[in-house]
Amino acid sequence: MTTESLLLDVQAVSYAMQGRTLLAPVSLQLHVGERLLLTGPSGSGKSTLLKIIASLLEASAGKITFEQRDITTLNPEHYRQQVSYCFQTPQLFGETVYDNLALPWQIRQQKPTREQLVASLASVQLAAEMLDKNIEQLSGGEKQRVGLLRNLQFMPKVLLLDEVTSALDEENKLIINSLIDSLVREKNLAVIGISHDVNEIRSANNVLKLHAPAQGAEHEPA
């Protein structure tokens, strides 16, 4: 990997709240077109680390650079468009699936065609009729897919995935992972994900195992 391909450099980042360490110091690097997976037991700080990288939480110590610039010096809105975080339980907005998929376009003062959004739904095996479906009628798996598609309307450079396939059956997990793999391969998307799925771990370039805060983290062979 070259310096030019380095997107994220996480340097000894840790997090504590009310005197309790929730994330022991972690260091990692993420390059263009790389897929890195975080594993480890509950309470090891995996989601906390992703939220810090996404600039949703402020680290207690350490430093993160994006394209060799300290993320604390960057415009948060612009940074989050480039480094996009997908929640395990998506926060959906408005009333319909259309409202959610159109939101990234509206932020950029643009309007998508229905054909564009229908094609997006088709990429994760969701029917065109889903576009007008009320979000309260969606299953957990449908919500996860809609949340992911919302983040992919404008391709970020880095996608942060917080167990986004946890509510999916094996068939739909395969669909989502195939989509992500193709984006990594064809669009040079870089991904940091949290997963305990053996197949997802095997597809990663690197695996970082987090332990309890007193123990830190270790890289494992993918």
Where are these regions (language model features)?
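Hydrophobic anchor residue at the start of the ABC signature
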Residues: 147-148
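Conserved catalytic motifs of ABC-family nucleotide-binding domains
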Residues: 90-99, 108
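Conserved ABC transporter NBD signature motif
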Residues: 62-70, 79
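Conserved ABC ATPase "signature" region
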Residues: 114-130
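Conserved ABC ATPase signature
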Residues: 134-138, 142
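Catalytic Walker B motif of ABC-type/P-loop ATPase nucleotide-binding domains
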Residues: 159-163
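Helix-to-loop junction immediately C-terminal to a conserved catalytic motif
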Residues: 54
